Amino acid sequence: MIFQEKQKFVQWWLWLIIFTLTVISFMPNENNSFNYVYILFGCLIPIFFYLMELRIKVDNIGIHYQFYPFHIKYNTFFYNEITKIEAVMYKPILEYGGWGIKQGFKGKAYNVNGKYGVKIYLNSGKNVLIGSQKHIDFAVFANNELKNHLIVNKK
């Protein structure tokens, strides 16, 4: 079995800002000419945000995550690196400085939307938060796999 989730930036206010900046980029400057660099970025930024996606997979090997296009391939937290997994509600702006790939006082976060996630505590003493709209299912599935891993390794 496997747990999977894909998330995109869907905040209406973010898309309003991006749309506004795109429209502004097509406005002529004071010389009544166009700045093609602004137009280029005005077109590329919405495409870039549309393509951004947080992908999560949980299986019997570990917890895999990819923040596309920043991560070309999945990164993995193997169960032998994990001490605890818990579903959490958090404050993205106050605790991590917003959404995206963030480093805050409470550890690293990968999130794109909302205020729910799964906190992964590592043997190293560090912790990582992965934002999730299915945080309960994610945590239950991952904890079951973590228990199975611990049982197998005790034998």
Question: What feature does the model see in each segment?
Answer:
Residues 14-15, 74-77, 131, 139-142:
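A short, polar/proline- and glycine-enriched secondary-structure boundary/capping micro-motif
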Residues 1-8, 48-50, 55-57, 69-71, ...:
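A generic structural signal for short, solvent-exposed coil/turn residues
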Residues 42-84:
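Conserved beta-hairpin
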Residues 66-126:
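Non-transmembrane, membrane-adjacent beta-strand/coil modules in membrane-associated proteins
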Residues 1-31, 109-110, 135, 152-155:
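N-terminal membrane-targeting/pre-transmembrane regions
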Residues 3, 107-155:
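A membrane-cytosol interface segment of integral membrane proteins
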Residues 21-30, 57-59, 79-90:
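Charged, low-complexity, helix/coiled-coil-prone segments
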Residues 30-41:
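Hydrophobic alpha-helical transmembrane segments
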